Amino acid sequence: MMRPDKAATLDRHQTAVAAGGLKAMMPVRRPFLDFVLTVIADAGFEEICLVIGPDRGAIRDYYQQDAKPRRFTLSFAHQEKPRGTADAVLAAEAFAGPDHFLVVNSDTYYPVQALRALHLLGEPGIAGFWKSALIAEGNLSAERVARFPVIEMDAQGILTRLLEPEDAPAPPPDGDVLVSLNCWMFTRTIFRACREIAPSRSGELELPEAVRYAVARLGERMRVLPFREGVLDLTSRSDVASVAARLAGQQVRL
């Protein structure tokens, strides 16, 4: 279910989608996920897998019947229970095969430059986004950006630490830091990490913790690609109007 907001104004269809918890299918002229899939295809990806829950057949039906993609092949993996983002990654293990693969949120519209750079990277990596650009160029408030994990890297641009905000050191004088919005290029090493980490306090398997484990325990080297770009995030009902306005001129090409 989308985060409630009494000040948000939604039409009847949008209200029904928000209540049903299908954030990615929020109608903003077209389902939001149409735009997400379009930009992933624009970045050069030709095989895409959506991880869905057992009660999310409407998503599968939509893309198999109403909006069948032509630019890429679309597969579905099933997460039996909502046990966290690392568990969702495990659900797609059979799809991933032996190659590098992209992992992103379905409720975030990332800049094509970031996705294309990861596609061309040829090694594990993370797209890091400067806090100032997220606030200035996307639809995220400073309060929300402050909750994202902070990225630290060495002089060679390799990820050294992924810190929760409460564990991060004081920011530099300008307050700008690189943060993670779950935009990754992984190898199969991540599956071992996802299986071996302990659940969080909420009982979920969290992807940031799996990344920390892969780096610290399994020797995975992850290249950090910094971007001064904004994203469009569809977390709460109050995001719908701003996201719809930003996507008004964008074309969907599935």
Predicted regions and their residues:
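Short aromatic/hydrophobic "clamp" motif used to bind/position activated sugar donors
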Residues: F101
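N-terminal glycine-rich phosphate-binding loop and ensuing alpha1 helix
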Residues: M1-I59, L74, Q79
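Glycine-rich, basic loop-to-helix element that forms the pyrophosphate-binding segment
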Residues: G84-A91
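Active-site acidic Asp-centered loop
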Residues: V104-S106
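Terminal amphipathic alpha-helical/low-complexity segments used for targeting or macromolecular assembly
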Residues: L37, A43-F45, I158, L181, ...
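Conserved core of the sugar-phosphate nucleotidyltransferase
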Residues: P111-R188, R192, I197
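Short helix-capping segments at alpha-helix termini
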Residues: D66-F72
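A structural signal for short hydrophobic beta-strand segments in well-ordered beta-sheet cores
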Residues: M25, I151-M153, V224
